[in-house]
């Protein structure tokens, strides 16, 4: 795993740039007790670096870091990293939002879709301990129409702009219908257009969104539906952007592979994967490259590294 320390420095600088007023001068969130030498920003940057290298196993990550002891003199233990990664998940999400606003602040057309996030095979669902003591956050059985299969886990809902930047997302039980996500975000957006698939088809929800926040929900008609109209081709083409994002997250960030034993750990991993995707898009943005070409974005990043 070459250049891990160099890539870490680049990502750390980006996180530091977008964390103003969120952390102190040492890169830590305000809290009581001993000030950690390995700062909260460094924990976030290390997690994002691992995700961008395709390393989603903490055990494998710390085995790789054995070669970089001189570059990380204050590196914490694996157990401390696991705990602090969960602790800093909200800070990581706030930094991601700041980056997304810098890339795509004036967007008024968004694509909405959902993606299954299985936590184990169907046969092992009853033995899965994820969420065993918290039913509200526990996984459930669901059905994916696109893949024509049942699964046990969660459902990732995402709202992205036409350029492919994720502005909002949420994780729900697999059994929750896609359309309920729109009720959660209708107060966050105003006077814009949402492009969805047939899973978001509902006249009552369309009317409610428009009356509440002047949001137009554009979905394709079913063939046997009353007052059928053909799909507007530019909308159909634009909506595929969110599907491309999900494909990239499954391929490069291994969204559907789960090592977490608790819900908070799984949620922290999802936040890291989406934040890593957003940072790669930001690197392409400042290099005037297509935002969707994230595979080799870090190789083209020539910004001077200040981390040491």
Please state what every model-predicted region is.
Residues 1-308:
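Short alpha-helical elements
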């Amino acid at each position: 795993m070459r250049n891990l320390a160099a890539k870490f420095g680049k990502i750390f600088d980006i996180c530091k740039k977008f964390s103003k007023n969120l952390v102190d001068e040492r890169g830590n969130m305000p809290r009581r007790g001993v000030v950690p030498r390995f700062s909260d920003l460094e924990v976030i940057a290390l997690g994002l670096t691992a995700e961008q290298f395709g390393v989603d196993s903490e055990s494998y990550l710390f085995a790789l870091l054995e070669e970089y002891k001189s570059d990380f003199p204050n590196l914490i233990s694996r157990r401390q990293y696991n705990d602090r990664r969960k602790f800093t998940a909200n800070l990581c999400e706030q930094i991601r939002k700041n980056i997304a606003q810098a890339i795509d602040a004036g967007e008024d057309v968004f694509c909405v879709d959902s993606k299954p996030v299985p936590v184990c095979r169907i046969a092992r669902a009853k033995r899965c301990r994820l969420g065993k003591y918290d039913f509200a956050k526990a996984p459930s059985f669901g059905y994916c129409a696109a893949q024509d299969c049942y699964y046990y886990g969660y459902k990732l809902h995402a709202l992205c702009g036409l350029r492919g930047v994720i502005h909002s997302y949420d994780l729900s039980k697999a059994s929750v219908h896609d359309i309920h996500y729109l009720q959660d975000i209708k107060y966050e957006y105003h006077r814009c257009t949402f492009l969805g698939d047939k899973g978001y088809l509902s006249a009552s929800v369309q009317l409610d969104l428009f009356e509440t926040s002047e949001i137009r929900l554009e979905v394709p008609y079913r063939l046997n539906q009353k007052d059928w109209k053909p799909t507007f081709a530019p909308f159909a083409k634009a909506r595929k952007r969110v599907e491309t994002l999900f494909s990239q997250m499954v391929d490069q960030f291994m969204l559907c592979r789960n090592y977490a034993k608790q819900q908070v750990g799984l949620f922290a991993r999802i936040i890291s994967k989406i934040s890593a995707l957003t940072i790669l898009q930001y690197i392409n943005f400042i290099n005037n490259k297509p935002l969707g070409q994230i595979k080799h974005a870090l190789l083209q990043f020539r910004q001077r590294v200040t981390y040491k």
